[in-house]
Amino acid sequence: MARRPFQLANGNGEPIRGDVWIDETGGSDGVIVICHGFKGFKDWGFFPSTAEQLATRTGRPVVTFNFSGSGIGADMENFTELDKFERNTFTQEIDDLAVVLDAAQAGELPALTSRDRFGLLAHSRGGIAAVITAAEDSRVGCLVTWNAVAYANRWSAKQRKEWRRSGRIEILNSRTGQMLPLGLALLEDSERNAQRLDVLKAASRLSVPYLVIHGTDDESVSVADGVRLAEAGPSASTRLELIEGGGHTLGAVHPFQGTTEHLTRAVELTAGWFSENLAD
């Protein structure tokens, strides 16, 4: 299994850093692209292991990447780009994902010839970009979300008022102890582009097979979000898999300490879904 790093630039000139995971045969034509969630990054916990397992089990290349506003710097591990984290928006993440798909289609990613058929796997907030992209971009042929959010604007009226008053809010990163800033751009994006960022409406427009995986004990995103996403998707091509007792990260931690029963189940379901539904 080869892991080939790459760096792209989005429309603002900001770097999108990622990796291509590919076996010695070069894999089939369909490519799986993984989107991390809020405060996540491509090398967090289960992502490298999941990428390697999906590449091995499905025979398809897998791409992992950091959204340009993830806050993770060139060392791939630490939140050293807090200015970008503060400016990040949902729309920017959708645009970043398009940059990755465009590069793969153009043959600009290492070890990959031109590809034009993609499967998306997204965790948590990454599901917003993935579901909307799957609804808008005909190159996407298959979708899986893990513990994804069903709503972009998740803040109360009180929180939004305080956010506007102060110009920013701060979120604790319990792993590092850092306070991570969110600027007004995120709130304004969620309001200005509310129609496009309606995740449930996007799910209802899907024309591709969609697997919703959600842990019943998710402490960050209610299992109700997963149920709503599955209910919104077309009934003939959408499937809901609840992982009994599964938490938000399916029991995985960072640094990665190995798989768990819940994570193993999610990977098995995901690999099967892509193998069955992502055409070459």
Regions found by a protein language model. Give the residues of each.
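Catalytic active-site module of serine/aspartate enzymes centered on a nucleophile-bearing elbow/loop
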Residues: 246, 250, 254-280
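Short beta-strand/loop motif that positions the catalytic acidic residue
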Residues: 205-207, 212-214, 218
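Short, surface-exposed "cap/lid" segments of acyl-processing enzymes
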Residues: 24-68
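Alpha/beta-hydrolase active-site loop
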Residues: 83-109
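Catalytic histidine neighborhood in serine/cysteine hydrolases
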Residues: 233-251
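N-terminal cap/lid segment of alpha/beta-hydrolase-fold proteins
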Residues: 1-26
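Short alpha-helix in the alpha/beta-hydrolase fold that links the catalytic acid
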Residues: 47, 208, 222-231
